[in-house]
Amino acid sequence: MSSERDIWITEVALRDGSHAINHQYTVEQVVSVAQALDEANVPYIEVSHGDGLAGSSLQYGLSRTDEMELIEAAVSVCKKAKIAVLLLPGIGTIRELDAAAKRGVKMVRIATHVTEADISAQHITRAKELGLEAVGFLMMSHMASTEKLVEQAKLMESYGADVVYVVDSAGALLPHEVTERIRALKQSLGIEIGFHGHNNLSLAMANTLAAIQEGATRIDGSVRCLGAGAGNTQTEVLVAVLDRIGLKTGVDLYKMMDLAEEIVAPILQVPQEITRDSLILGYAGVYSSFRLHAERAAKRFGVDSRDILVELGKRKVVGGQEDMIIDIAAEIASKKTATGAR
């Protein structure tokens, strides 16, 4: 396929997909996936803990392998693709950013809650000092008005971001909402716009196409839909759809299909599908990585995981507040016991 691109895809299976396998990636798995992605001519490959650099912890989930080892492994086998990392200020620090840059990372995505772009300034500034491509990543974008989103995106642009993303962390946005947000950003910013979707309402592809139609040129995908919740926009399908539309990605479709079937599918612990819990994530507007945490808490306290997720949505809990899952599960169990005792 031509190396010319209308759409630049970032493959997130080695970062967002980490959530789906409880952060258990091995060096061997990362090498095999990254090498195949590079051979398929995917331009960007994101590698890090599911919650970004330094995410390995009791709160977010312990990594099987140190993420710096995984980053080094991916860099070592990629001849064309650029390795990217995710960094959430407050979890990852400048120290981790510097360490990743030393290991050959070329792009960092600085992720904040959609209303907290101001905390990205230091990290975006440092990324540019290191010569990295800096991306502003506005998570849980469904939780802010379009006007607020534009305001926050402008802040990231002012700090030096090369790209700003609308990030549908909960898979809660509907296509017309994506259209409105991307259109407003395109009219208000002078930098590229990106979109990151989740498939909890079976709308990842529709939302991605809506974003592209309004001018988004940076798009996230996950091979075999390997990501938090019900996964992300499925990369190999996205490449096929965009080819049908006539938009160039530069990605080899057959190689992506083979990678999905032969390398990634065996890594999946269970098939990526829209389960009742992932559906509730999109319905209630809850951070997609909360699904497995909620399932474990539900089992521990003998309650329905859906009740936990719905309550999380009501309280507008955001990424970084995983400890609330246990608190809410305990509250529901306590109320259940009290009701049963009457």
UniProtKB/Swiss-Prot annotation:
Gene3D superfamilies: 1.10.8.60, Aldolase class I (3.20.20.70)
Domain of life: Bacteria
The EC number(s) this enzyme carries: 4.1.3.39
UniProt-listed GO biological process terms: catabolic process; L-leucine biosynthetic process
Entry keyword set: Aromatic hydrocarbons catabolism, Lyase, Manganese, Metal-binding
Top-level enzyme category: lyase
Pfam families for the chain: DmpG_comm, HMGL-like
Active site: 19
Site description Transition state stabilizer, residues in chain: 15
Entry binding sites for Mn(2+): 16, 196, 198
Positions with a binding annotation for substrate: 15-16, 169, 196, 287
InterPro entries to which the protein is assigned, alphabetical: 2-IPM_HCS-like, 4OH_2_O-val_aldolase, Aldolase_TIM, DmpG_comm, DRE_TIM_HOA, PYR_CT
Positions of the Pyruvate carboxyltransferase domain: 7-257
Reactions catalysed: (S)-4-hydroxy-2-oxopentanoate = acetaldehyde + pyruvate
GO molecular function: 2-isopropylmalate synthase activity; 4-hydroxy-2-oxovalerate aldolase activity; manganese ion binding
Family classification: Belongs to the 4-hydroxy-2-oxovalerate aldolase family.
PANTHER family xref list: 2-ISOPROPYLMALATE SYNTHASE 1, CHLOROPLASTIC-RELATED (PTHR10277:SF9), HOMOCITRATE SYNTHASE-RELATED (PTHR10277)
The protein's name in its UniProt record: 4-hydroxy-2-oxovalerate aldolase
Organism name: Geobacillus thermodenitrificans (strain NG80-2)
Gene name for this UniProt entry: nbaI
